[in-house]
Amino acid sequence: LGDPDLPKREGCYLPGLAAGGVQLQDRFGDLSHPGVSSAEMAFLAAAPTRMEALLIERLPGLLPQLGVDDLAELAKAAVLDTQVSPTINLNGIFELVPADVTTQQALQTMLSELMHQLLAEAAGQGLEESFFLHVAPNLGRDAQGQERIKPAAAGDVGTTDIQFMLTGSIKEAGLLVLLNQHIQRRWGESPLGETFNVRTAPHDPEALLALVQQRIPAERMPLLVGVGDTVTSTASADGTGWLRGGSDRGFLNLLQDLGAWCGRSNRVVLVDSSHGEVDRPSHADGTLRGITDPEDPLRIDTLMPDGPEQYIAWFRQLSERRRVG
């Protein structure tokens, strides 16, 4: 753009939500975190350094062939220092053991134990209800509501990262935040309340759907297009059903259910991010194996097999049409 200050001055940023809806950005690039305490922000700020230290402690036993300097570099690269969702990503480490499923599974177990240690440390500071772990990709939730790790298998590394997230920061709740903001701009009122945010929202998908049905007139619902890249479906070990998960499945299901309720043809778009961006099942052969199944209630309307570049081109085209219209 030539001028680094122009986007902020002219309001060129894309407004929206990040980190499961807990971080808001306006078109001037200003960030806010409704419902988040200063103690929580302080713990999150220190978390990446702590994650790196814990990795350096635990990796030598799993990767004995690496020296101290290599391990330190690997640990640093694995920690993603995002402000409100610090993450450990194993993709770079998995590249060192590409065909060693046993070591890959051991790394996944190590990662889970490490992140649970971080949860315990937060609880020790009086923040026991503040955080949760988001596993990506996952195999849905267990009986305790915890996201299941997708174990590495031949040809599929499974879970690659775990995010340390604020409670309430789920995309389904973020969808309601966006709906509330849209109706406020369009109709001048906030049906879910002026201070509604993901931390005050219900966590259960059925409760979120019921809240919309109770508070928002169906005729005020906009057409929604949901875009995701992480949806999984794996046959259960006993062969009697499917373990469905993926970090985008929940909000895409809710978006679909909202459309069925209000009579809108909401659309679900799935982007193939298996081209080196992350380790995910590919759309290439058209079977969508590992992504969906014949009994899947989530209906995918559009596939973008060429990945992020195809999505960006589509988004630009959509923006041009909107501007012309």
Per-segment meaning from a language model:
Residues 1, 39-63, 100-125, 172, ...:
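Well-ordered, non-membrane alpha-helical segments in soluble/globular domains
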Residues 1, 60-66, 138-140, 196-203, ...:
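Short linear motifs at secondary-structure transitions and domain/linker junctions
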Residues 1-83:
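Active-site phosphate-binding/coordination module
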Residues 5-7, 13, 51-52, 75-93, ...:
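Short flexible/disordered coil segments
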Residues 22-29, 56-66, 127-137, 268-276:
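Noncatalytic linker/hinge segments flanking ATPase motor cores
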Residues 24-26, 97, 234, 278-279:
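Short catalytic/ligand-binding loop motif for oxyanion handling, primarily in non-cytosolic enzymes
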Residues 71-223, 231-235:
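Conserved acidic, metal-coordinating active-site core of Asp-based
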Residues 165, 172-325:
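Mg2+-dependent phosphoryl-transfer enzymes with acidic/Ser/Thr/Gly-rich catalytic loops
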